[in-house]
Design a protein with these regions (language model features):
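Cys/His-clustered metal-coordination modules, chiefly Zn-binding fingers
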Residues: 193
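Extended, regular secondary-structure scaffolds
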Residues: 196-202
């Protein structure tokens, strides 16, 4: 797990850099690169916001996650994604810590921590990916989220009218947006209550 490649051309958006790291390591492993779907990435940002800045809910004995129904009922409308274009989520990474680190380090040190993480990363079930990064209350804690799907490029997770709704604070991939001011992000907004679910320890990847 120590030989990662971070050599691709990316933007100043840390979520784009996270997707670049994922695709570079998939292709180095002889797996196909994934389509960076901004609609799916926006859902990843909404997924983060559902945690309301609570790192303790990401892993450990108090681990929780949003209910699956929230994708169609809350995440998609908040992003302006058509519910009829949602596709199956085939894998997820979620990490949180108090110190901000850049995307390559977040990928290798927080999201890729065990064999299950690698199984998700290299899965042949994925065709699309979307990543999001955000901080809380102008700073710590910081969240990184990646969602994978088996949807069809340019037809799944489509925005109403082809335009995404504003979703600040935070950054998501594929949005052609510069988002380098991680330490200036304002407080994460409140969303619905969680359905309890056991996850892998904080910062680890977790499957469906």
């Amino acid at each position: 797990m120590s030989h990662y490649c971070f050599c691709g051309k990316v933007t100043d958006n840390p979520a784009d850099k996270l997707v670049a790291a994922i695709n570079e390591n998939r292709t180095a492993h002889k797996d196909s690169s994934l389509f960076d779907n901004p609609g799916l990435a926006c859902l990843a940002l909404q997924y983060i916001k559902a945690y309301q800045g609570d790192c303790g809910a990401v892993g450990g004995s108090d681990a929780k996650k949003p209910p699956e129904s929230q994708f169609a009922e809350e995440f998609a409308p908040n992003c302006g994604v058509k519910a009829s274009t949602l596709a199956r989520i085939t894998g997820r990474f979620l990490g949180c810590q108090t110190k901000y680190i850049h995307a390559p380090e977040a990928f290798s040190e927080i999201l890729i921590r065990n064999q299950k993480s690698l199984d998700i990363l290299y899965s042949k079930n994925h065709t699309e990916v979307g990543a999001a990064v955000t901080g809380t209350d102008g700073g710590s804690p910081y969240f990184w989220c990646v969602l994978f799907s088996n949807g069809k490029s340019n037809s799944t997770f489509a925005f109403e009218g082809g335009v995404a709704k504003p979703t600040k604070p935070g950054c998501y991939s594929g949005a052609n947006d510069v988002c380098s001011g991680a330490h200036d992000w304002s407080q994460v907004s409140v969303m619905l209550l969680f359905t309890a679910s056991v996850l892998i320890a904080m910062g680890f990847a977790f499957p469906l």
